[in-house]
Amino acid sequence: MILATGVSHAYSGVDVLRDAALTAAHGEVIGLIGPNGSGKTTLLRTLYRALTPDRGTIRVDGVSIDSVRPRELSRALAVVVQEPAGELPLSVTDTVMLGRIPHLGTWQRQSQRDIDIAAEALDQVGAEHLVDRDFGDLSGGEKQRVLIARALAQQATHLLMDEPTNHLDIHFQHEILALVRQLGVTTVVVLHDLNLAARYCDGLVLLDRGEVVTSGTIDDVLQPAVLEPVYGIRMQRLVAEDGCPQLLFRSLREPHPGTHTHGSREHVEARVR
């Protein structure tokens, strides 16, 4: 379980996060959503101590992260962040094996079990064919899958992900998020795509200008009356055949959808990015 209460943070004296709260119960997938600059990534970074909040508390399974040693924290939290291309001058195998470091002693060498876990993680994200490549030579989407594999190899009890679907095509966007749900690991994930959030998250936290606007179930948060003032765009909520909510988006400059004929270009779905 991850519990954050009253979390605030400022950059150069400018508040970017104010009294944010978040609860991710055991096995839940909680999505952080909101426009660019709303504080999603800042909140996520405080959860794994990449940023120290000016105020507030963060607990993982009831223990304050401030009292946990780095190695212990790495066993509890696996993180997928948006890393610069080519930052890791390693092979794909070595990159994924980094996820096993929290489980090794100071002088302990990697075992066959560690190697098998890393290989399985690559297979889970559809990247087993990249095993002999250099990480720096991969495309953006390939790098993203390898970084997700590294987090999976860590076998932590909690997973934190910042835009894990970046650079991925539609197929792998759904494959990766479906995999995350199947893992049953407590997960907090930053997502821009609201329809992906609707399909794969158990609950959502909506941020805007550094504050939590609302949080709750998919049905609670993904309502036009809630989202339109935040995103500044017209929304229509539909329901897919499997019962999952789906949102259609239109610019506020366009007339109300009822004034258009079916098949017009204004009826084409556009994702909020």
Could you tell me what each predicted segment is?
Residues 109, 134-138, 142:
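Conserved ABC ATPase signature
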Residues 48:
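Helix-to-loop junction immediately C-terminal to a conserved catalytic motif
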Residues 159-163, 168:
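Catalytic Walker B motif of ABC-type/P-loop ATPase nucleotide-binding domains
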Residues 33-35:
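The feature captures the beta-strand-to-loop junction immediately N-terminal to the Walker
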Residues 228-273:
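ABC ATPase nucleotide-binding domains
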Residues 97, 112-130:
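Conserved ABC ATPase "signature" region
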Residues 56-64, 73:
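Conserved ABC transporter NBD signature motif
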